[in-house]
Amino acid sequence: MTDRPERRLARRAFLRGAGGFALAIPFLPSLLGSRVAADASTSRRFVGVFSLNGQFEANWHPDMTGAATVAPNTLARSLTDIDGPISNIIGPQFDGLRDKITLLRGLDGLTESGHNRSFPLTASAHTEGGMERGSAPFFPYSVDAVLEHAPSFYATPPVLGAMRLSPMLRRYNGELRAGESFSWWTEDGVTTRLPVQSDAEVVFRQVFAGSEPSEGPDPNERRQLVIDRVKEDFDRLRTSPRLGGQDRERLSNYADHLRDLQTRLAAAGSVTCTGPDVAYLEDAEAMYTNHIDLLVAALACGITRVGTLFIKHVRADGEMAGFHSNSHLSGPEAERTSAGLNAFIATRVAELLTKMDAIVEPDGNTLLDNSLVLWGNELGDGGSHGQLDMPMLLAGSACGRLRTGVAIDYRSEEGVTWTNGGKRLGRPYSMLLTTAMAAMGLSHHEWELGDGPGFGDYQKLGHRYAKGGGWDRYADARREMLPHLWMG
């Protein structure tokens, strides 16, 4: 062990243990000195969260009574002005987050598609055959992958380019079914559907315990908490006179977070060598909590700056409870059923946001403030099974680049509809994704990977069913940011 671990730790952000074991820790600016710490830039993070089967309009969108016109075809209302729950889906669990979230309406996918699990981060339909047959999107790039490969986002290679989580329960004789990936990247003419992780224990071992799942650590090491494996280095750093009070608290909170997470995983029976607890493996709520805690820890300590989380389940017992079939129905009963099922998903999202907002970073902002979390869906209105009027919730301001605490409606004036008298049209959904990437510090040169400007699929421009000019007014606006959301 070195006599000056704090000098090395400040630069590399690792604690060392026996056998070369290394544990990443959060950035601790007090070890760098005031001048260097003041010059250190805050890293932005991006998280994409996805759910299925669309939303009923009556459930998702807030009351916009009293909304102000803030730009052409753009209305906005403060979320703090809404009495009671924001909506039937965005309920009391978001009350403490009202000034940190943004709800968007009037963003339309310009793609011909039904169920499309890759849409939220590609703005593209799948080629013939559908996703179930493994076909790629027409535009085979997802935002998370673009960020992972962007030099302006990762100036130096990260420990992990992105943490992609698709939690699945251990059913079917204890076997873990493979999760679904909605992330894509194309390089040298080869399109790849990027892998996801579905087992929290495997992710923990790979990222925090330093072992590959195929080999696994020694059984004694599997029972030992990772913090205990670096105890000497941890204690020396924690008691260092150079470590400031806020950084000491930050380090202790991080250690407590990992201890609690690893203890819960051990109780499930997979971190130790005992058999899994069947009741736990059917508890979707606990499963998502473990994956959320993994993601938050990885973002907080700089292991990665990009994450995705697929929330498939709608009940704690893991049953789907007719989630898909109900999306094809209409009327008050179907709306109530959908609200009840989506409440489970919304609570998981609120848990993620609340935990990110509880971590105070060296610049005084929270991890959530310095991030952009995008909760999207594969569909708009589930009944129509299309991508018009996508239900979108954003959280975090990406270090002040995006406006929060508001609901924004981008729908056009009356008469600009899908078919005569149909749904009012808004702006291209792809404008949200380019705004998100700009908020992460990218230039259009890094996301324009197709044949022209913009991002995603623009099949419906000029469509005969798009009345009143449809989206044609935005045909030349593919590099523009979403008004009122974008603060620069």
Question: Where on the chain are the PLM-derived regions?
Answer:
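Ligand-binding pockets and gating/stacking loops
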Residues: 2-488
